């Protein structure tokens, strides 16, 4: 018995050591980027790596915020690009001038938050309907959604690009937001959570005279809240880091996101790694904040989703 306990303790210690090593390996790139943002160019390009900055400087952030200026926001006349001689939207209101990096950050936050909110709303409704409603073709529809999860974005790029152009959404942030709203993974995740809602609870709500909307908002939403929290994090990070779609759908300088802006910082003949690391550090802050804010729901969502799946 005692040997068995010692053997289990040894396994736990080995597992803990492996997990710590993996955590260090995953966290090291973030550490290197953040510390690199505060290093001098000479320290970054040194032959011997400098694991910890000997001198902390803000020169990279000063360069990042002094490269060029842009309005904090712009409100354009809808569909005005069709009537403009330059093909650009006609701006009727613009915010104060700020560093371009701040504008990139504002564009990305708006895009990611809008995609997160709209995806959580549509996915929770669709998942609930697929889990609790009986209608013809339900199984076929869910099978198509699962199949859509396996399709890479490159497969639907041309139809999606033509659709956004037809809807006059091309070269707007909505061209990146709208395709995310129908994210198949979100519908799949919400269906898994909705299946765990007791049917008796919903039946009693109908007997009490609750409408479909009231049943959904007062019963379904509170019970799938952990799943919504997990989906919110997934959607926010997916939209924030979706460099490919942003590169294809956005062409104007005023529509640049933080990912496109960082890529633009690379010069043709030389690369200022300190400047790029400063931009990457700025881009990582909102993701870290969102993860910390939704960490409880994210952990619950992953655990409960795994059990229900």
Each language-model region and where it sits:
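A structural signal for multi-pass alpha-helical bundles of membrane permease subunits
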Residues: 6-7, 11-309
């Amino acid at each position: 018995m005692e040997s068995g306990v010692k053997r289990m303790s040894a396994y736990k210690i080995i597992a803990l050591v492996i997990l710590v090593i993996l955590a260090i390996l995953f966290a090291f790139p973030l550490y290197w980027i953040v510390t690199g943002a505060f290093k001098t160019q000479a320290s970054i390009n040194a032959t011997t790596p400098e694991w910890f900055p000997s001198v902390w400087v803000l020169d990279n952030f000063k360069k990042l915020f002094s490269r060029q200026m842009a309005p904090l926001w712009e409100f354009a006349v809808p569909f005005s690009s069709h009537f403009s001689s330059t093909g650009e939207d006609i701006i009727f209101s613009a915010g104060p001038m700020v560093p371009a990096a701040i504008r990139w950050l504002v564009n990305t936050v708006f895009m990611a938050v809008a995609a997160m909110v709209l995806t959580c709303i549509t996915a929770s409704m669709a998942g609930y309907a697929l889990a609790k409603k009986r209608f013809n073709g339900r199984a076929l529809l869910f099978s198509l959604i699962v199949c859509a999860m396996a399709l890479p974005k490159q497969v639907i790029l041309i139809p999606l690009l033509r659709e956004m152009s037809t809807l006059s959404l091309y070269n707007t942030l909505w061209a990146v937001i709208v395709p995310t709203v129908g994210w198949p993974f979100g519908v799949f995740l919400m269906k898994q959570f909705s299946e765990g809602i007791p049917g008796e609870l919903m039946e009693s709500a109908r007997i009490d005279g609750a409408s479909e909307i009231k049943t959904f908002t007062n019963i379904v939403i509170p019970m799938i809240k952990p799943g919504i929290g997990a989906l919110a994090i997934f959607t926010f990070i997916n939209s924030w880091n979706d460099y490919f779609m942003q590169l294809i759908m956005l062409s104007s300088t005023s529509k640049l996101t933080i990912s496109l802006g960082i890529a633009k910082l690379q010069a043709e003949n030389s690369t200022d790694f300190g400047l790029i690391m400063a931009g990457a550090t700025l881009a990582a802050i909102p993701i870290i904040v969102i993860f910390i804010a939704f960490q409880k729901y994210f952990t619950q969502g992953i655990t409960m989703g795994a059990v229900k799946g």
